[in-house]
Amino acid sequence: MNWKRVHQIVAGLVFLVALGVYFATVAPTASFWDCGEFIAIAYKLEVSHPPGAPFYMLIGRLFSMFAAPENAAFAINLVSVVSSALTVLLTHLIVVQLVERWQGGAKETWQHLAALAGGVVGSLAFAFSDAFWFNAVEAEVYAISMFFTALVVWLMMRWSRLAREEEAALQGQERHPFGLQANRYLVLIAYLFGLAIGVHLLNLLAIFFCGLIFFWDEYDREDYTTMQRF
């Protein structure tokens, strides 16, 4: 069985389920709190309350350009719909990677099924949680902020896997810690952090996750004591 294709199909179905549910429940116009403000600044390219959300504003403006003026609020709400559905997709991929890494690499049929089941259950449980669903159907920065966070986490885990594979291929040869081809993902992650702060500063918290993953893969050893790690 072509498990790569199966994984792609399941991930696609998870994305479509989330997208369909969010689209069916999206707010037709402005919701409470900051939503009206974000719709206005995106449509008119104006300035929001500090610290601002310039990248969100530009994306919202792009979506509103394909809608009639009376449907601008609905079009900008769709930014959250699409971003949240992509976040659910990335959550599925992250859980699958975590399960496969815990398994030491999925080789048997039951291992693939376990990884897929974990990804589907985890991502859909997250998708239909109250707080996430609430932000997925209105014009708020939190949906696209979560997308950036999930994307950075997934890219960092992908870097970790590819870096380990490259290190194994080197067979113990000396190399510079930044000398792997997989490190292009680190450059992309740094770029995404720059974009993400144009949405919400909360995304910067993912830097600690990236730093720990880099430390564990590059400098940590199984025989290290706690003092040696610090």
Model-derived segments and their meaning:
Residues 12, 78-108, 151-158:
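Transmembrane-helix motifs of polytopic, lipid-linked glycan transferases
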Residues 42-74, 81-82, 89:
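Short hydrophobic/aromatic helix or loop-helix immediately within or flanking a transmembrane segment
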Residues 148, 202-215:
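Transmembrane-embedded, aromatic-rich helix segments that form part
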Residues 107-113, 152-186, 193, 212-229:
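Membrane-interface transmembrane helices that cradle and orient dolichyl/undecaprenyl
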Residues 23-24, 69-77, 102-112, 122-146, ...:
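Aromatic- and kink-enriched transmembrane "portal" helix at the membrane-lumen/periplasm boundary
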Residues 1-21, 96-97, 103, 108, ...:
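Start-transfer (signal-anchor) and selected internal transmembrane alpha helices
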Residues 5-32, 126-128, 200:
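Transmembrane signal-anchor helices characteristic of membrane glycosylation enzymes that use polyprenol
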Residues 21, 26, 60, 64, ...:
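Membrane-water interface at transmembrane helix exits
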